[in-house]
């Protein structure tokens, strides 16, 4: 497994701009051969906007089942976990409606 440690880039993630930058760093890892651990240990804040831009927009690159096979989460605090789940649910719903 490959680890992507979000705390390398900060502890508070609130902007779409940062979400896009980190998604661009994540995508080559996720497209690699090993499963990627998305490690949020030490991260205090993950906004809905950041979660959508960084995590949920990965659904534009691959189906949900493939994303689940290629990634796993670690160290999300309850509020950050909720932001990620809400972002994934909303993005999935939008993509499902478009198909």
Where are these regions (language model features)?
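Extended, charge-rich low-complexity interaction segments
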Residues: 96-99
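N-terminal presequence-like segments and adjacent domain-start helices
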Residues: 1-10
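Amphipathic alpha-helical interaction surfaces in cytosolic regulatory modules
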Residues: 10-35, 40-89
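Helix-rich interaction surfaces within compact, conserved domain-sized segments
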Residues: 92-93
């Amino acid at each position: 497994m490959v680890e992507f440690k979000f705390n390398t880039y900060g502890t508070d993630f609130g902007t779409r701009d940062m979400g896009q930058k980190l998604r661009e760093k994540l995508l080559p890892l996720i497209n690699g051969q090993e499963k990627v651990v998305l490690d949020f240990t030490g991260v205090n804040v993950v906004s809905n906007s950041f979660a959508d831009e960084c995590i949920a927009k990965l659904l534009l690159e691959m189906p949900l089942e493939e994303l689940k096979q290629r990634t796993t989460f670690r160290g999300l605090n309850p509020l950050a976990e909720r932001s990620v789940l809400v972002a994934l649910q909303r993005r999935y719903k939008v993509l499902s409606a478009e198909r």
